Amino acid sequence: MQPDAAATAHPSLSFYSAATGLYSSLHPPLPLPSDPSLSLVPHLFSHLPLHHHSLLVDAPTAATLSCADFRRLVSSLAAGLRRRLHIARGSLVLLLLPNSLTFPVAFLAVLATGAVATTMNPSSAPAEIAARLRDTAPSLVLASTHNAAKLPPLAAPLVLVPDTFQQQHDDDQFDFFFHALLETDPETPVEMGVGVGQDDAAAVLYSSGTSGRSKGVVVTHRNLIAMVELFVRFEASQYTRPARDNVYLAALPMFHVYGLSLFAVGLLSLGCTVVVMRRFNVDDAVKAIRKYKVTHLPLVPPIMSALLRANPPLELDSLLQVSSGAAPLNHTLIHHFLHAFPHVDFIQGYGMTESTAVGTRGFNTCKHKKYASVGLLAPNMHAKIVHLESGSCLPPGSYGELWLHGPAIMKEFCFVTGYLNDDDDAFTRKDGWLRTGDIAYFDSDGYLFIVGRLKDTIKYKGFQIAPADLEAVLIRHPEIIDVAVTSDEDEEAGEIPVAFVVRKSGSTLSCTHVMEYVAKQVRTRRSYTTQHSPYFLAWEHYKIIITASAQSAFLLARVSNSSKNGSLQALCPPVQINMADIS
């Protein structure tokens, strides 16, 4: 994609200041709450409708929670956590939960106690869970019965959480959840967010950042309130259709910032209906869309690809809008989607864990339908496009690194136990600006286009994979003396990981053995086949040292050519490294 040629003339544009190099939102600024003692849950409840509308629906069982049910359950669980387990300000609670009706209740109840919540994929391998427990030292773990058996030894209390509020179980830990819900009379008001305010930490959400191993992103109550107002509620205000009439399908994981911001927090303030899927499956999603007359479907590129591959082609008449985020979409996929679903309003958005999912949002108008763009800057947000070498600010039509500034930008990184800044925190957040690591440009209408990435994280189906995390797993193998992990492009997944392995001299380590080793250490999913599958290569007589960075792409191309003349030995034909999968 080429930048807008008209922008190269640098006209006088309302969203760009040539004097400062800053980009501002074309949307008017929105007032945000000024009370420093305000926390997320009271703010959310101030918007939550009082009528007995179905706020949450469990897609598999059709169980529902009304707005009144939801308010009561959050209040009751918060009181139970305080009184029975002494969860309060200074506590950290790990949510190891799948999508369910109970996830939003549990997440907000933890915040209502004044504690900090941290989320994790419930399908994580025991070694990954153990590492997270070491990093965060939680006061309490909330887990599902589906993954309780594989939990490593815990130093903190464990409470098993059901998928719905009608579920029964013989386990005493499971029963505690229900007893905690009975701690307060439904009619008795419960004080929310005791002792915490807007500047206090609310959640630690893990991200690969721009480099290195995964680290915790500390987001505050102010960040989450800004997300509710600048992302979810602002977008709803731009349409004439009442938000309460919308039905959203929650096919994205709530442990990820994209799903969390929408389904466990923001959309609840609108009083619309959220239909919750445990995990994405095309057939189940289609059934849910038709059964519940879903109007809005937030998704990531692999879900869009799966919908387009359905045979016979789908007819989803109730859908009004599909929004894509978390990973780039290629032009071919966009074209096919617009052709298959011409009645659907398709938009893209841009946000990061570090920006609490706030950044840009697409809006289609009679004048502008820029489907390949990630949209306009959100209200109250500012941006820079920074030259990669000189550090100077660039005008519209010029490529550079995207920097963001605004009330949704994270507080800090935490990397080890406690809220300690990681070494690259100052690099990532410079004078309040978030360096995204993404290469982008603004066109002459203020629309943002993402064209590449500086950072070495791998975007697999919308999930971030840190090469350093995979390298740390592989290098622990006794027959591997060096390893470099990079990525290769893939039409369906976006990117897939590739590992270059150096074996010990004389080792007969095979690709199959390496794969079996990785599978025991890293969360895996069902096989995923592609013509551009990743593969292992080994060097026995000499060693190449390379970090997983921009050099890796160059190495990948060189390796492909070198292997043809025998200078490199392929351990086996191309195979798949099974990574996180939302399907």
UniProtKB/Swiss-Prot annotation:
- Residues that hold (E)-4-coumaroyl-AMP according to the record: 258, 326, 348-349, 353, 455, 459
What are its GO cellular component terms?
peroxisome
> EC number(s) on record?
6.2.1.12
- Which reaction is catalysed here? (E)-4-coumarate + ATP + CoA = (E)-4-coumaroyl-CoA + AMP + diphosphate; (E)-4-coumarate + ATP + H(+) = (E)-4-coumaroyl-AMP + diphosphate; (E)-4-coumaroyl-AMP + CoA = (E)-4-coumaroyl-CoA + AMP + H(+)
This protein's source sits in the domain of life called Eukaryota
Which cysteine pairs are covalently linked by disulfides here? none
Fetch the InterPro entries from UniProt: AMP-bd_C (IPR025110), AMP-bd_C_sf (IPR045851), AMP-binding_CS (IPR020845), AMP-dep_synth/lig_dom (IPR000873), ANL_N_sf (IPR042099)
Q: Which stretches are annotated as coiled coil?
A: none
Q: Which UniProt keywords apply?
A: ATP-binding, Ligase, Magnesium, Nucleotide-binding
Q: Which leading EC class covers this enzyme?
A: ligase
- Detail which positions bind ATP: 207-211, 215, 348-349, 353, 438, 453
Please give the residue ranges the record annotates as the region SBD1.
281-348
GO molecular function terms listed in the Swiss-Prot or TrEMBL record: 4-coumarate-CoA ligase activity; ATP binding; CoA-ligase activity; trans-cinnamate-CoA ligase activity
* Record flagged with keyword Nucleotide-binding: yes
ATP-binding is among the record's keywords: yes
Residue ranges of the region described as SBD2: 349-419
Pfam families assigned: AMP-binding, AMP-binding_C
- Cofactors (names): Mg(2+)
Comment, domains: Both substrate-binding domains (SBD1 and SBD2) are involved in the substrate recognition, and are sufficient to confer the substrate specificity.
Function, as annotated: Carboxylate--CoA ligase that may use 4-coumarate as substrate. Follows a two-step reaction mechanism, wherein the carboxylate substrate first undergoes adenylation by ATP, followed by a thioesterification in the presence of CoA to yield the final CoA thioester.
Q: Which family does it belong to?
A: Belongs to the ATP-dependent AMP-binding enzyme family.
Q: What is this protein called?
A: 4-coumarate--CoA ligase-like 2
Origin species: Oryza sativa subsp. japonica (Rice)
